Amino acid sequence: MSFYAAPIARLIEEFEKLPGIGHKTAQRLAFYVLDMPQEKVDRLANAITEAKQKTKFCSVCGNLTDTDVCPLCSSEKRDSSVICVVEDPRDVVAMEKIREFKGLYHVLHGAISPMQGIGPEDIKIKELLDRIKEGNVKEVIIATNPNIEGEATAMYISKLIKPLGVKTTRIAHGIPVGGDLEYADEVTLAKALEGRREI
């Protein structure tokens, strides 16, 4: 039995469906929305609706955009000879935050995961190969996640790219800046050692 009026209970229930939102947080959000002025509630609802309706995937890289070709792909300031391959549009945001990468991206929209029934044909590998075969690409940086699925995807892609004569690299994994070696796990230490570079 709910202690709330049906519309409030439904709002709480909908908030609970969001990732990382438990019952208590859902209640707080629902009551916060109820306390908001109607104008702010309307703006929030419109922003959600507009984002859902107007956002699509870039026809070139698969990143989220509101145009056919995203601003990154259409920018003349980006190096189109280097493509960084990521699993998810959120990974593009993470890479852009460091302001180091000046090339283009390719979003796979997933990783190979036989346990979840996701094979190479279920993610955007063919589209990546098509971009490479256009001839302008000199390097592909594979930046999939450092987990079993990400590593399997990286290996699969690198084997497909190798015959095309394009340099293929994998981002290094290792000790975070400010971290202590004693707290790092064996895999992280091994990856850090493997990804070492000359100074």
From Swiss-Prot:
SUPFAM superfamilies: Recombination protein RecR
Gene3D superfamilies: 3.30.60.80, 3.40.1360.10, 6.10.250.240, RecR Domain 1
InterPro entries: DNA_Rcmb_RecR, Rcmb_RecR, Rcmb_RecR_Znf, TOPRIM_dom, TOPRIM_RecR
Zinc fingers, C4-type class: 58-73
GO molecular function terms noted in the UniProt entry: DNA binding; zinc ion binding
Highest taxon above the source species: Bacteria
Limits of the Toprim domain: 81-176
PROSITE patterns in the record: RECR, TOPRIM
Keyword line: DNA damage, DNA recombination, DNA repair, Metal-binding, Zinc, Zinc-finger
Gene Ontology BP, a term: DNA repair
Its job: May play a role in DNA repair. It seems to be involved in an RecBC-independent recombinational process of DNA repair. It may act with RecF and RecO.
Family membership: Belongs to the RecR family.
Protein name from the UniProt record: Recombination protein RecR
Source species of the chain: Acetivibrio thermocellus (strain ATCC 27405 / DSM 1237 / JCM 9322 / NBRC 103400 / NCIMB 10682 / NRRL B-4536 / VPI 7372)
